[in-house]
């Protein structure tokens, strides 16, 4: 375990701040510039559309009656603490996991603030094909998904790195 926070994954925490600020600024812009369900076409297959998400990813549990707000708050706080502890315990050189954890934390905190402030998450990135729309999402959701993907990738790549080092020792 690193002896100082400067030698640990916490050195990557600036990414949490960057994701959080980008997410919150984009959502404030949407709230001040769009009416609910207002949509602006930017590119073929891509709109800015202001929607409210009372659930989790892909509107999971959005019609559950309100209790899910506190469940998702607890989950966001819990995962942010857990990943921060893991960041403190790993080397700053573990760039893929450090990046992944900080992306997830930044995204979780961005959506957490929405839930606490508004009771819902502001979503606005709307991709579609013909008449089929992918569920709208935001910068925080993107950061969480990219972070989760990097964690999965690291589990495969790290395993290969360990195998290579074992082969070299033999």
Swiss-Prot record:
Membrane protein topology class: Multi-pass membrane protein
Catalyzed reaction equations: Release of signal peptides from bacterial membrane prolipoproteins. Hydrolyzes -Xaa-Yaa-Zaa-|-(S,diacylglyceryl)Cys-, in which Xaa is hydrophobic (preferably Leu), and Yaa (Ala or Ser) and Zaa (Gly or Ala) have small, neutral side chains
Pathway: Protein modification; lipoprotein biosynthesis (signal peptide cleavage)
Active site: 123, 141
Enzyme Commission identifier(s): 3.4.23.36
GO MF annotation terms: aspartic-type endopeptidase activity
UniProt keyword Transcription present: no
PANTHER family per the UniProt record, alphabetical: LIPOPROTEIN SIGNAL PEPTIDASE
Assigned protein family: Belongs to the peptidase A8 family.
Alphabetized NCBIfam families for the sequence: lspA (TIGR00077)
Identification of the protein by name: Lipoprotein signal peptidase
Provenance organism: Shewanella piezotolerans (strain WP3 / JCM 13877)
Organism taxonomic ancestry: Bacteria, Pseudomonadati, Pseudomonadota, Gammaproteobacteria, Alteromonadales
């Amino acid at each position: 375990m690193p002896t100082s926070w400067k030698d640990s994954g916490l050195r990557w925490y600036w990414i949490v701040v960057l994701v959080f600020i980008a997410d919150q600024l984009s959502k404030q812009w949407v709230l001040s510039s769009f009416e609910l369900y207002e949509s602006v076409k930017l590119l073929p297959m891509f709109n800015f559309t202001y929607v409210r998400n009372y659930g989790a990813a892909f509107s999971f549990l959005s019609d559950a009656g309100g209790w899910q707000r506190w469940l998702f708050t607890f989950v966001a706080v819990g995962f942010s603490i857990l990943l921060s502890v893991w960041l403190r315990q790993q080397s700053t050189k573990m760039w893929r996991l450090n990046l992944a954890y900080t992306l997830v934390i930044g995204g979780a905190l961005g959506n957490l603030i929405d839930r606490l402030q508004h009771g819902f998450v502001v979503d606005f990135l709307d991709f579609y094909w013909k008449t089929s729309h992918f569920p709208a999402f935001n910068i925080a959701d993107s950061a969480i998904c990219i972070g989760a993907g990097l964690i999965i990738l690291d589990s495969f790549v790290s395993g290969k790195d360990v195998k290579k080092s074992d082969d070299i020792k033999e």
